[in-house]
Design a protein with these regions (language model features):
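Transmembrane helix-loop junctions in multi-pass membrane proteins
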Residues: 30-44, 64-72, 98-113, 132-144, ...
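Juxtamembrane and boundary regions of transmembrane helices in multi-pass small-molecule transporters
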Residues: 3, 136-152, 166-167, 171, ...
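N-terminal alpha-helical transmembrane segments of multi-pass membrane transport
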Residues: 1-90, 94, 272-301, 308, ...
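Hydrophobic core segments of alpha-helical transmembrane domains in multi-pass membrane transport
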Residues: 22-35, 49-59, 91-98, 128-139, ...
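Transmembrane helical segments that form the transport core of multi-pass membrane transport proteins
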Residues: 241-354
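Interfacial loop-to-helix junctions that mark the boundaries of transmembrane helices
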Residues: 11-17, 38-48, 80, 113-122, ...
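Intrinsically disordered, low-complexity non-transmembrane regions of multi-pass membrane transporters
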Residues: 1-17, 21, 72-86, 200-211, ...
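Helix-loop-helix junctions within the multi-pass membrane cores of secondary transporters/permeases
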Residues: 76-78, 85-156, 334-415
């Protein structure tokens, strides 16, 4: 029975992975065989990378369900039950710090800013996440509305953004998405659910989300402050070198070189969380042996999934994305990159590993009121729109602030009109949508296009992650607005039906028995 259930779950996750990745493969293949021919070696590397990505997603989503989510929920619940604010603050800061410092994408971000020592940047960003994870948890425990905190923090961010060097803006805003990776997001979200589960008040459900939203603010503030302190002359960028292979053996060597690197990187990434959990298990949790075995198996699945996923996207997808961007932008009608970017953006967010975790948790926590399908559609529309705007930036060189400032103004304005839970989900969605697929396909695509057009890659191409993180804040809240209007219409209809029934009953009461007999 257990084996059959396991096979069923694995098959279900495989179907989800195929459904998420096949549209991207289809779009790339259509482009390759029509307006954007790419070398066979790059195409074959992309196809092999896609296979690894599908298998990796399958294992990751199953592993996150079995391990990362229950780990986060149990730690959150246990910390809340301690009733000791000092313990909660210290442990949440340590947790936020260690899961950020081990994020592989943070190392890449540090390399983009040579004016600041790598470890200075990494420690500053990790400290930012640690502080804001503490702030997010305290917000939940004391019932402080998320919108109030966001309305204070984002104006501060934009005031700082107006005085830092232009080259620094895109890297700073990208950092918010970079530090909320596929491994940390499910854990942090589950931590929030664990904290809110202990509360029994009516606002507990609304406060289940919002941790990722505030954790994304920390890195942006940290990088902007470092930009002011170090007065950097600009961030660094080296043109992407696309490795071409002459045969299948050379192509296989590319993956052989990439695989050990990601085996090591993901071990470093997962180890701090695993150690934290096992120490917590020994000292406080004392979970049953059967539960621990399931969690350990889930951790192994998560590890295998992330290794395969990251190898596939970095070795296979990154070169293809860069090359496609160069070829399409080099056409006599480069404007076509805007609708193509939107089409890719619409489908690629479905392949983000943490998106499935978010949509399923939202559907479960709202008892189906907010369906996974509606969430997925809203995210896809948001990312499509963001990619269109990002490609406009590549073509025109417009400053990212002209997009981010009105975008966040609209997002913050909507917080006054939509249900609170939608605001929290929306601001969490920004960090979830801007995952590894954005960093390894959309960003190289944007960089390739910028290189072909002769633009400034640092100011015009970087910032894609920030754009992808911004638009779901608007689309998810619009979904909330639609949901609210529908609920109000249902209530009005129910009230109308109740009034009609009441009138009928009163009329019947006025009919005497003789009239009833005659009838």
């Amino acid at each position: 029975m257990g084996l059959q259930l396991y096979q069923k779950n694995l098959l279900e996750k495989l179907k989800e992975s195929l459904g998420a990745v096949l549209p991207i493969i289809g779009i790339v293949l259509v482009l390759c065989f029509s307006i954007a021919p790419i070398p066979n070696s790059v195409l074959m590397t992309f196809v092999v990378g896609a296979v690894l990505l599908i298998i990796g997603m399958m294992f990751f989503t199953l592993g996150a369900e079995m391990a990362m989510t229950p780990m986060g929920e149990r730690i959150g619940t246990k910390l809340t039950n301690t009733r000791k604010i000092s313990v909660v603050i210290v442990l949440c800061f340590i947790l936020g710090f260690i899961i950020t410092i081990s994020e592989p994408d943070l190392q890449v971000l540090a390399e983009q800013v040579p004016s600041i020592p790598n470890y200075t940047l990494i420690i500053a960003v990790a400290t930012g996440v640690g502080i804001f994870l503490v702030a997010a948890v305290l917000r939940m425990l004391f019932g402080i509305p998320l919108a109030h905190m966001l309305l204070i923090l984002y104006p501060i961010i934009f005031i700082l953004a107006s005085i830092v060097p232009q080259d620094f803006l895109t890297v700073a805003f990208d950092s918010g998405g970079v530090t909320t990776g596929p491994m940390t997001v499910p854990f942090i979200m589950a931590l929030g659910i664990g904290f809110s589960a202990v509360r029994s008040d009516k606002h507990a459900e609304n406060d289940s989300f919002g941790l990722v939203a505030l954790c994304s603010v920390g890195p942006i503030l940290a990088v902007l402050l470092l930009g002011l302190l170090y007065h950097p002359g600009g961030s660094g960028y080296e043109q992407t070198m696309i490795v071409k292979t002459d045969n299948s053996v050379e192509m296989w060597q590319l993956f052989q070189e990439g695989l050990p690197y990601y085996i090591k990187e993901m071990l470093i990434s997962l180890l701090p969380i695993i150690l934290f959990f096992f120490i917590f298990q020994i000292v406080s949790l004392h979970l049953h042996k059967k539960t621990m075995v399931k969690i350990i198996i889930g951790i192994i699945y998560t590890y295998i999934g992330l290794v395969l996923f990251l190898t596939g996207v970095n070795v296979g997808f990154m070169p293809a994305g860069n090359y496609l961007g160069q070829v399409i932008a080099g056409l006599s009608y480069p404007w076509i990159i805007v609708p193509i970017g939107m089409l890719i953006g619409y489908f690629i967010v479905k392949a983000e590993p943490a998106v499935y975790v978010l949509t399923e948790q939202v559907e479960e926590l709202t008892s189906g009121a907010i369906s996974a399908k509606a969430m997925g559609m809203s995210l896809s529309i948001g990312v499509a729109f963001s990619l269109g705007l990002a490609m406009v930036r590549v073509l025109t060189g417009i400053s990212i602030l002209w997009f981010l400032l009105p975008g966040y103004a609209v997002a913050l304005g909507l917080t006054f009109f939509v249900p609170k839970i939608f605001t929290a989900i929306a601001f969490d969605s920004g960090g979830v949508a801007s995952g590894p697929m954005t960093a390894t396909f959309l960003l190289p695509f944007s960089m390739g296009a910028c290189e072909a057009l002769g633009g400034n890659v640092v100011t015009d191409a970087f910032g894609v992650v920030a754009m992808v993180a911004m638009t779901p804040l608007i689309t998810i809240q619009i979904l909330g607005l639609i949901y609210q209007i529908q609920e109000q219409m249902k209530e009005k209809q129910a009230a109308k039906d109740y009034t009609s029934i009441k009138v009928c009953i009163e009329n019947l009461d006025n009919v005497d028995n003789q009239e009833i007999i005659e009838l």
